[in-house]
């Protein structure tokens, strides 16, 4: 899928949600373009990402702080902090579920958004808004549920796209009272193990900004690769 064969549209400039004082702008694919898992994986390789059915990448004037980050699955080696996280959560069970927002999912998602983004446009979503943000009709998506025991309390959901040769972490939401368990990191570790089981080459973690504390955890998974607009650079 070459750039000459796709139509890119651009949003208006708006205030950046991650870097204070910066202006943000996105370019996105025309909604008329027919997508599937294979085509979307090619777009991920070029620095794109999806939000619901919309595929976009940053195109900000005078700023390239947002960089796509992916982990080469076969080369990943957990650090001490990752092993501690796994041991602390050894009692959790993971179940793969279809990308359908149940009432239980929605209640957890709302609590998470209210805790992490109380004044954002994401606050208090209804069912259609939540499911529309997390899933896409043309993409194979799995909701990985993390529970305290089989059929026990739902602590987290790791929304993941399962592609021909890669996994992409779409969004993870979890119980605010369980934040100390490091469930975001645990979700990535699970996605890596699942990618290894499926024989996938990469796990895509979305965009990373070096100066954004909320994104610092992504760079702790090493080695990883950063897309610089022309190719992927290894970061050991």
Curated annotation (Swiss-Prot):
Keywords: Acyltransferase, Cytoplasm, Transferase. GO terms for molecular function: arginyl-tRNA--protein transferase activity; leucyl-tRNA--protein transferase activity. InterPro entries: Acyl_CoA_acyltransferase, Asp_Glu_LeuTrfase, N-end_Aminoacyl_Trfase, N-end_Aminoacyl_Trfase_C, N-end_Aminoacyl_Trfase_N. It is an enzyme of class 2 (transferase). The keyword Transferase applies. GO terms for cellular component: cytoplasm. It catalyses: N-terminal L-glutamyl-[protein] + L-leucyl-tRNA(Leu) = N-terminal L-leucyl-L-glutamyl-[protein] + tRNA(Leu) + H(+); N-terminal L-aspartyl-[protein] + L-leucyl-tRNA(Leu) = N-terminal L-leucyl-L-aspartyl-[protein] + tRNA(Leu) + H(+). HAMAP family: Bpt. Belongs to the R-transferase family. Bpt subfamily. This is Aspartate/glutamate leucyltransferase. The gene is bpt.
């Amino acid at each position: 899928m070459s750039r000459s064969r796709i139509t890119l549209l651009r949003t208006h400039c708006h205030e950046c949600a991650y870097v204070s004082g910066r202006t943000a702008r996105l370019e996105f694919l025309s909604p008329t373009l027919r997508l599937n898992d294979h085509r979307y994986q090619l777009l991920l390789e070029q620095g794109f990402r999806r939000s619901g059915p919309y595929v976009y990448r940053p195109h900000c004037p005078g700023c390239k702080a947002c960089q796509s980050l992916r982990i080469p699955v076969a080369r990943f080696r957990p650090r001490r902090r990752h092993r501690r996280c796994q041991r602390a959560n050894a009692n959790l069970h993971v179940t793969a579920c279809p990308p359908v927002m149940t009432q239980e999912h929605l209640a957890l998602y709302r609590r998470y958004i209210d805790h992490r983004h109380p004044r954002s446009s994401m606050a208090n979503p209804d069912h259609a808004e939540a499911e529309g943000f997390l899933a896409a009709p043309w993409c194979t998506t799995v909701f990985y549920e993390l529970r305290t025991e089989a059929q026990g309390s739902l602590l987290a959901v790791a929304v993941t796209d399962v592609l021909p040769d890669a996994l992409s972490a779409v969004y993870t939401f979890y119980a605010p009272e369980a934040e100390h368990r490091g469930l975001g990191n645990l979700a990535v570790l699970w996605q890596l193990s699942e990618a290894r089981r499926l024989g996938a080459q990469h796990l895509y973690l979305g965009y990373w900004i070096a100066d954004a504390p909320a994104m610092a955890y992504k760079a702790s998974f090493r080695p990883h690769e950063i897309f610089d607009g022309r190719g992927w650079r290894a970061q050991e």
